[in-house]
């Protein structure tokens, strides 16, 4: 990939008020994107956002920039990221733009683009937008300026799309479900989808105020959901993150069910229904228990680099239809073009309803291995600790001790001078000791 100035692996992201997430930058980004995308045709762009207070400011800036370039904006209001991908496809819009920083705190925000088919913008288009950013803004003739309008039925359209991924012959009428929307973009979508499919729904994290997105709620912090599931004696809980592209579940005993377990359930059900084409894609962080459980079922498994973008790339390379990260990004290419928390959750609920099994029992075929993660800070510029002979020697010793019933993964953080030491195996005490032994070797360098 070329050395781009603004676009990262997941669009442009940062703290609001600091470059690049400022009104003037975002206005220019809208204009530059408009100039590039106007070369292609429909001249309309879908703009969605999550529930952050800064979304109002940033969507206005984007709209002004797009209008100056001669493109019209269609606003969805607060809407999950996968909903914007879906609406971009169905409206045949030139692109979709999501204003969100996903699972980050409210004071961060970001801009992410989808192309006309609901997939990520090609690198070449992002590079063309960056090149346009270097130019002075110029306005099209007044008669050519873009307009702005709202898609008044955006939520209803997406609710119907989600429901259509759940089999008609099944119902959720037997289930009591606690849903946690992270005070984010799914707050007016997910409870309605589940209720319309017959579930008894208790909703939490559905009162966004602009600053409480992801705050002690949602997929990145399921403690409130676990407590409520137990208090309500519910059958299960479902948590989404701030922009609705991740899902984490909780069984009736309050146990967390992560993206690895969710993918296992969906892949096994696909196999049972004769609908699984090929295998499943996880990441370097996917639990070894997932790999072994899929192997027992005869389902091929491949690991991609961490990041839903890389999972999708590996799925496309293999021609497979299902992929997931343990953080709850689940991509089902038979249903959607991108990670969709609501759609993934519905496939697990369908497996429960069809088999008359609890979430707890559906997970029982997969034994999760203890996975210990230790972060070790090192001095930036002091060389690569992973290349040091002493670290390599200790790592090799641990790998021999674990044999084929465990894994060691050492990787550098992409954002700060940290080495992430992950050790996985069947015995938690042994795995913990091994992880700290490697961490100590890294510290000693």
From Swiss-Prot:
Binding positions for Mg(2+) per the UniProt entry: 102, 241, 243, 245
A Pfam family: PGM_PMM_II
Residues where Phosphoserine is found: 102
SUPFAM superfamilies documented for this protein: Phosphoglucomutase, C-terminal domain (SSF55957), Phosphoglucomutase, first 3 domains (SSF53738)
The EC number(s) this enzyme carries: 5.4.2.10
Residue positions of the active site: 102
Chemical reaction(s) catalysed: alpha-D-glucosamine 1-phosphate = D-glucosamine 6-phosphate
PTM comment: Activated by phosphorylation.
Molecular function, one GO term: phosphoglucosamine mutase activity
Keyword Isomerase carried by entry: yes
A single cellular component GO annotation: cytosol
InterPro entries: A-D-PHexomutase_a/b/a-I, A-D-PHexomutase_a/b/a-I/II/III, A-D-PHexomutase_a/b/a-II, A-D-PHexomutase_a/b/a-III, A-D-PHexomutase_C, A-D-PHexomutase_C_sf, A-D-PHexomutase_CS, Alpha-D-phosphohexomutase_SF
Listed name of the protein: Phosphoglucosamine mutase
């Amino acid at each position: 990939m070329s050395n781009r100035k603004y676009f990262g692996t997941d669009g442009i992201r940062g703290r609001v008020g600091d470059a690049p997430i400022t009104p003037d930058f975002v206005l220019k980004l809208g204009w530059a994107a408009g100039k590039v995308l106007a070369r292609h045709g429909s001249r309309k762009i879908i703009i969605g956002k999550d529930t952050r207070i800064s979304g109002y400011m940033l969507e206005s800036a984007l709209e002004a920039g797009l209008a100056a370039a001669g493109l019209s904006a269609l606003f969805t209001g607060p809407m999950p990221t996968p909903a914007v991908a879906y609406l971009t496809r169905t409206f045949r819009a030139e692109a979709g733009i999501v204003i969100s920083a996903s699972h980050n705190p409210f004071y961060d925000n970001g801009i992410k683009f989808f192309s006309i088919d609901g997939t990520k913008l090609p690198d070449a288009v992002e590079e063309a937008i960056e090149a346009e950013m270097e130019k002075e803004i110029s306005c099209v003739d007044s008669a050519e300026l873009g307009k702005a309008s709202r898609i008044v039925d955006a939520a209803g359209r997406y609710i119907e799309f989600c429901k259509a991924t759940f089999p008609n012959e099944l119902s959720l009428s037997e289930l009591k479900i606690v849903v946690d929307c992270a005070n984010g973009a799914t707050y007016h979508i997910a409870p309605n989808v589940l209720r319309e499919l017959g579930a008894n729904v208790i909703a939490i994290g559905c009162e966004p105020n602009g600053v409480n997105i992801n705050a002690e709620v949602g997929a990145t912090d399921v403690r409130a959901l676990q407590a409520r599931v137990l208090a309500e004696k519910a059958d299960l809980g479902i948590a989404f993150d701030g922009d609705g592209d991740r899902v984490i579940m909780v069984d009736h005993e309050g146990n967390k069910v992560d993206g690895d377990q969710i993918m296992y359930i969906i892949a096994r059900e696909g196999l049972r229904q004769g609908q699984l084409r090929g295998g499943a894609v996880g990441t370097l962080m996917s639990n070894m228990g997932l790999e072994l459980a899929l192997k027992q079922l005869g389902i091929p498994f491949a690991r991609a680099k961490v990041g839903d973008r890389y999972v999708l790339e590996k799925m496309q390379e293999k021609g497979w239809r299902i992929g997931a990260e343990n953080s709850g990004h689940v991509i089902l290419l038979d249903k959607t073009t991108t990670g969709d928390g609501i759609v993934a959750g519905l496939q697990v609920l369908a497996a429960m309803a069809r088999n008359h099994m609890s979430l707890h029992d559906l997970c029982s075929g997969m034994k999760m291995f203890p996975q210990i993660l230790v972060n070790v800070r090192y001095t930036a510029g002091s060389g690569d600790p992973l290349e040091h002979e002493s670290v390599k020697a200790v790592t090799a010793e641990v790998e021999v001790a674990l044999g084929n019933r465990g894994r060691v993964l050492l990787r550098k953080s992409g954002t700060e001078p940290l080495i992430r030491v992950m050790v996985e195996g069947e015995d938690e005490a042994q795995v913990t000791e091994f992880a700290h032994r490697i961490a100590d070797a890294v510290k000693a360098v």
